[in-house]
């Protein structure tokens, strides 16, 4: 299992300008690096915004057996944008300011919690406060240019033309940040083999015991089904 820190978050060091497409490129490079070292079936797992990132990464790579995501948030959709931001003011005015400022002031960093509703990242208020104080996590500062590109991603192919691999959406049932209906906007358009499961009792970051147990069960089941299908295809 490889769980990398992408630029702007975690312990990864970076230099120069960082935009959202860099995340897609980094994820693809990491996958190709490990695939070149060892031939194994490869699955991508995306948590929160990482769900659509996993989809984008899989879209550009030939040997991906499956994608698992807790959310599939298409930020191009106005309804999705409106619900992921921190406030009504941000939805009405802030996003427009970010778009206008990106060209000239894209290098300026702002706390991600000013833009995203980080208070709802988990359903435990104490843990949410800890995460928002962590400058390598929900308390991170990110460039305006990154925010602009995150909110205006280039998604190719569109889900109606995606047939690269099966997709499993394991959406938290009690997500107070991004309701499952927001992920369904993108999920329902997918033209590949797909399945959706709800993680009972789980918040946006599924830390609850019941939700984690369901997450493990659904993921293992999905992996086994995909690998069995791969074996059948190889024998034909």
Regions found by a protein language model. Name each.
Residues 141-159:
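Active-site nucleophile elbow and catalytic-triad environment of alpha/beta-hydrolase enzymes
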Residues 24-41:
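Conserved acidic catalytic loop of the alpha/beta-hydrolase fold
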Residues 165, 179-188:
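Short alpha-helix in the alpha/beta-hydrolase fold that links the catalytic acid
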Residues 193-236:
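Catalytic active-site module of serine/aspartate enzymes centered on a nucleophile-bearing elbow/loop
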């Amino acid at each position: 299992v490889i769980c990398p820190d992408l630029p702007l978050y975690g312990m990864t060091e970076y230099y120069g300008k960082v935009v959202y497409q860099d995340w897609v490129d980094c994820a693809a490079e990491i996958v190709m690096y490990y695939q070149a070292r060892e031939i194994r079936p490869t699955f991508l797992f995306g948590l929160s915004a990482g769900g659509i990132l996993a989809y984008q990464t899989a879209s550009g790579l030939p040997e991906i057996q499956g994608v698992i995501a807790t959310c599939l948030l298409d930020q191009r959709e106005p309804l999705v944008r409106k619900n992921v931001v921190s406030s009504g003011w941000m939805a009405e005015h802030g996003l427009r300011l970010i778009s206008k400022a990106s060209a000239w002031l894209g290098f300026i960093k702002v706390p991600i919690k000013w833009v995203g509703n980080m208070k709802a990242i988990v359903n435990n208020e104490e843990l949410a406060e800890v995460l928002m104080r962590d400058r390598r996590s929900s308390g991170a500062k990110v460039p305006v240019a990154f925010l602009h590109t995150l909110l205006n991603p280039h998604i190719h192919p569109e889900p109606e033309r995606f047939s690269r691999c099966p997709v499993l959406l394991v959406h938290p049932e009690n997500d107070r940040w991004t309701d499952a209906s927001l992920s369904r906007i993108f999920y329902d358009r997918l033209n590949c083999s797909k399945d959706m499961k709800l993680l009972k009792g789980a918040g946006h970051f599924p830390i609850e015991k019941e939700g984690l147990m369901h997450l493990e069960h659904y993921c293992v089941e999905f992996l086994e089904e995909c690998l069995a299908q791969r074996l059948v295809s190889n024998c034909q």
